[in-house]
Amino acid sequence: MGKPSFLCIASYFKGNDFLRGMKSTGATVYLVTSKKLEHKPWAREALDDIFYVQQGPENEWNMEDVAAGLAWLMRSKKIDRIVALDDFDVEKAAFLREHFRIPGMGQTTSRHFRDKLAMRIEARDAGIKVPAFSDLFHDADIARFASTVPAPWIVKPRGQASATGMKKIHSAEELWAHLETLGGERHHFLVEQFKPGDVYHVDALSEGGKVVFARVSQYLDTPFDVAHGGGIFRSAIVPFGSSDEKKLLKMNAEVMKAFGMQHSASHTEFIKNRETGEFYFLETSCRVGGAHLAEMVEAASGVNLWYEWARLEEAVAAPEKYKLPKIRDDYAGIIVSLTRQEWPDTSQFNDPEIVWRLEDKDHHIGLIVRSPRRERVIELLDDYAQRVQRDYHASAPAPDKPTS
C-alpha cells in the first residue's frame, strides 16, 4: 500500500506547519479553503492541489456543494483521510467523513469538541466537575437555573471558538432581557455560572485513545477579560511537577477519554475556583490552540504541535508507529496585544530570552520568551506588560463572531 492521501479543510488561514509536516511523511496533501483566502501565503510547496469554496457573507460553506465537488474529485483521486485545521471546520470534516464513509471522527463525537453544551453534558455525566449550567430550550428550566444558581452568569454561544459572543449577566431580569435580544437564535446559546478564577489550558497530542504529549499553561489574564476588557493576552507554562500540573494532566486525560478522543491535537481549558481552589472543566477542541500558543509550547518543549499532529495523523492512516521528537523541559511565556501603531517597532525588547516575535500581523505586538527558570519568564512578561501598556497598547470591542 502506498502513502495515504489527506484532504485538509481550512476556512481560516492557518495550519501551514501541519501541511508541511504531512508532506514530510510522503503523503499526498490536498487543501480545501475559502475562495477569499486564495492569495494568502499557503505552504503551496507542501500541497499536491488546492481547491476553493465560494464562502457566504459570514464565511459559511454550502456543504452539499462541497460534497458534490469532492465526489467529482474522488472519481480520479483517492482520499484516505480528512482533517479539519480549525474549530469551525470540525463539523465540515465530520459531515464529509460520514457521507463518504472515510475513517475518523464522526458527527456525534465531533459535537463533543465543538458544541459547548454537549461538552458540559458529556463531562458532567463522566463525573468531571463543570460550572453549573443550563441549556436555553425550556423557559421553566431557565427560570429554575436563575432561581437556584447564584449570579453572575455567562451567556455564551454553543459553537464559537474563543471568548467571542459571550455576555456577563448579573440578574434574572437582565438574563430574560438578553434572551429576548437573541430571539430565535436562543437555542444556539447556553448559560452557566460565572465564578472568578484563574484559567489554565492543556495543549496535547493523543494517539490510540491515550494522551502522548501535554503541556499545562496558565493564562495570566483570562481570555474573557482580555476580549471584553481590552486587556493584554499573556500565558506561561506552569511549574513542572506542581500540584496544579498533576491535577490538570489527570483531568485532561479524563476529558479526552470521556469525549472519545482517539488521535488528534487538542486544546482544553479549565478554571481554578478562586474560593475553593478546585478545578472545573470549561471547554475543549480537537485542534491546535490559537493565539500563537503552539509557538509558546514549541519554545518550551521543542514539539511543534501542528507538525507533529500531521505526522501522527499520517502514522495512524499508514498504519505506522508514531514517535515523538525529543522533548525539552524549559519554561516559556507569551504576550500579545493590539497596538496603536500599524507596524510597531519592537527593538526596545532585546532580552536574550526572546525566541519569537509576531511580525506578520498589523496593529499587533507579540513576543515569546524562554528560560530554564519560570521566575525569569514571569519577570519578563510582567515587565513587558507594563511597557506594552505604556507604549503600544490599543483595545477594540470584542467581536460577536471571530474574524480570523
Identify the function of each model-found stretch.
Residues 1-109, 137-140, 317, 382-400:
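ATP-binding N-terminal substructure of ATP-dependent carboxylate-amine bond-forming enzymes
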Residues 15, 142, 308-404:
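Peripheral (often C-terminal) accessory segments that flank ATP-dependent C-N-forming ligase machineries
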Residues 72-79, 147-149, 184-185:
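Glycine-rich phosphate-binding loop signature in dinucleotide/nucleotide-binding domains
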Residues 98-165, 170-172:
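A conserved helix-loop-beta module that forms one wall/lid of the active-site cleft
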Residues 129-131, 152-155, 164-201, 216-217, ...:
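Conserved ATP-binding module of the ATP-grasp superfamily
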Residues 136, 166-171, 205-207, 239, ...:
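Short beta-strand-to-turn element immediately C-terminal to the catalytic PLP-Schiff-base lysine
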Residues 173, 193-261, 265, 272, ...:
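ATP-dependent carboxylate/phosphate-activation module, predominantly the ATP-grasp catalytic core
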